[in-house]
């Protein structure tokens, strides 16, 4: 029978947090993935000593955060298949493993390039974290600093049990607990400097202020990155159109936008790249509510219209009714399910 208390693998960090608890989801907000890896390895090694089953969800483009020579089961997933297949696959694996397994996830920021929107990362965490909690697991996650909207970070922080900011200042590591569920101490929520095997609280207000001010200035310098990835992508597309860049560069952007707006089926994407212009895709986005795919029937209608208009022998533009459709993005549908607490019925 395992104890409810779990070690991080760092005695000093255990002292700060009063250890981890069974059910904890631990989110690390980091500057660099190698800093996350530094804290993952001792956690994994100690869990193996305690004969825990550990599953590593591998889906990022960054180097693995768990060494291949450790006795850990690696489950490789492709987030480009979409939110639903990705979230359902993790749900199914966790269900099959049952109670008591431990999990390490690649950096969640990697999902941005696949899903194009912060909002769905928060949705993913909101459906995954509570389920792992009920299965008596301990799970490690990471987010890269300055890559996500404030609202996304807030939703993840609200959902998780433990949220830790990790600062690396010229190789010196500082851990700043922002949330530790159902635990408290007089110094728990101060920044702590790693010193040997210990973590020393920055009780000196000047030191703490300098550390946090440095992090704040980085946040301010990255102001444009506070925009959701989806909106940044379309701002880039609008900029390309306004500048009148070469056709090849516009075609590259069209292909990129199609993967986030039109769908994933190769035959449909091939037609979309052929018949849709950058102007077309930007006009469709302007008629969207939310983010995600506009839907198969809508894509079929738009493609059929463009194919007809491309015919040289008929003035279809004079015959067709004016286009007046609006679109509800697929992410609105998923968000409706998640926010109403119906995901497990759906999954």
Model-derived features: positions:
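Conserved inter-motif catalytic segment of the P-loop NTP-binding fold
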Residues: 49-113
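Structural recognition of the conserved hydrophobic beta-strand(s) that form the central parallel beta-sheet
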Residues: 28, 56, 104-106, 136-145
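Nucleotide/phosphate-binding sheet-loop regions of phosphoryl- and nucleotidyl-transfer enzymes
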Residues: 200-347
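Glycine-rich P-loop/Walker A and Walker A-like loops and their local beta1-loop-alpha1 context
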Residues: 5-61
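Short, charged/polar "capping" segments at the starts of alpha-helices
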Residues: 36, 61-67, 148-151
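Phosphate-binding/switch region of NTP-binding enzymes
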Residues: 137, 143-197
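Conserved catalytic network of the ASCE P-loop NTPase/AAA+ motor domain
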Residues: 18-21, 46-50, 94-98, 130-136, ...
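Substrate-engagement module of ASCE P-loop NTPases
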Residues: 114-115, 120-147
